[in-house]
Each structure stands twice: as structure tokens, then as C-alpha cells.
Amino acid sequence: MEWLSQPAPLVAPALLGMVLVRQFADGLQVRAQIVETEAYTAGDPACHAYRRKTQRNQVMFGPPGHLYIYRIYGLYHCLNIVTEPEGIPAAVLIRAAQLDRLPDWIPANKQNQPARAAAGPGLLCQALRIDGSHNGWRLERAEAGQEGIWLEGSPSWQTQLSIVQTTRIGITQGAEIPWRWYIGGHPAVSRY
């Protein structure tokens, strides 16, 4: 996955349509097709690493292809994929995805709207059971009986997708930067 070492604004749209796979120790795999992303880089005031390196954001400075997981509002976790060469803090927030199946732990109110089960960064982490313990994990296929998170697919077939680029949402600084991408018309795209 050498292509993850590119700038986050190039990686973010390339992730659309790819499948994020979450494997549990019992062998269960849940696949989520990525439908919405946002890019964050060192010179961006909305980036967690904008001012300096801290204990919280240090994963963003690490090698590309690792997970940067953080908590928002004290309640929800967000999944980011670190990009750019080591030492340059940047990441792509996975804002929303379409699950291939609804795991048993998905709340009953989401069972009627399966496309909405991971339609937002917090919902995505809940659906894939990703939390702070996954911070720093490397994206790599796991052996049977082991936990893992990895990507499947290739950005090369994206010509078939209707990709929309717009400004990021849910932030106050850098909100004018058009670094949000999503698959147009997809029902799993976040609502705000």
C-alpha cells in the first residue's frame, strides 16, 4: 500500500469504493465499502497535528497505512488512515461506509435502514467495533484466529463512481477547504 504515502487530499478520494475489512478473533469478518472521506494535513487548522506533536496525535506522524483513532464529544470514536511519508502528519477520516452485513450488535433501530448503520464516523466505528485500543494499528490482513483491519480493492476502477468533492463538515476551522469526497447519491453518506 505504498500509495498511502501520498498527500491526504490525493488518498481521500482514492479510498472511495474500497472495502475496509474488520476481522475479529473468532473469524467473523465485516466488510464496509467506503463512501465518504475527508483529508487533513499539517498546514490545515482543522488537523489535530496543526500546532504540534502530542501524545494524542503522534500516530499521525508515523508511517502511512496506520490507524489514527480518536474520540469526539467524549462519546464516539473516529477512524482515520495515516498518509504521507513518516514525519509529515496527515490522515484521511473515513466518514461513512456501507456494511456488507449487519452484525448482531447493531441496534434494532438501525436494522430497518441498513445503509444508515455506518453513515457517519461514530456510527462506522460502532458498527465495526473500533475504539481507542485500535489506535496505531497497521492496515494489514490478519491470519485466521487473529484480529485485523485492512483494505481491499484498488482505486484504479473508480471511473465507474460518481465522486462529489465539497467542503468538510462538522468543523469550525478550515471549513472552507474542499477536502471532503463522497459517492454521489449513495444512501450511506452522512447527513451533515
Curated annotation (Swiss-Prot):
Signal peptide positions on this chain: none
Keywords noted in UniProt: DNA damage, DNA repair, Hydrolase
UniProt-listed SUPFAM superfamilies: FMT C-terminal domain-like
Coiled coil: none
Enzyme class: hydrolase
GO biological process: base-excision repair
UniProt keyword Hydrolase, yes or no: yes
InterPro entries in UniProt: Formyl_transferase-like_C_sf (IPR011034), MPG (IPR003180), MPG_sf (IPR036995)
MF terms (GO), sorted A to Z: alkylbase DNA N-glycosylase activity; DNA binding
Pfam families found in the cross-reference section: Pur_DNA_glyco
Keyword DNA damage tagged: yes
Enzyme Commission number(s) of this protein: 3.2.2.-
Family: Belongs to the DNA glycosylase MPG family.
Protein known as: Putative 3-methyladenine DNA glycosylase
Organism annotation: Synechococcus sp. (strain JA-2-3B'a(2-13))
Lineage, highest ranks first: Bacteria, Bacillati, Cyanobacteriota, Cyanophyceae, Synechococcales
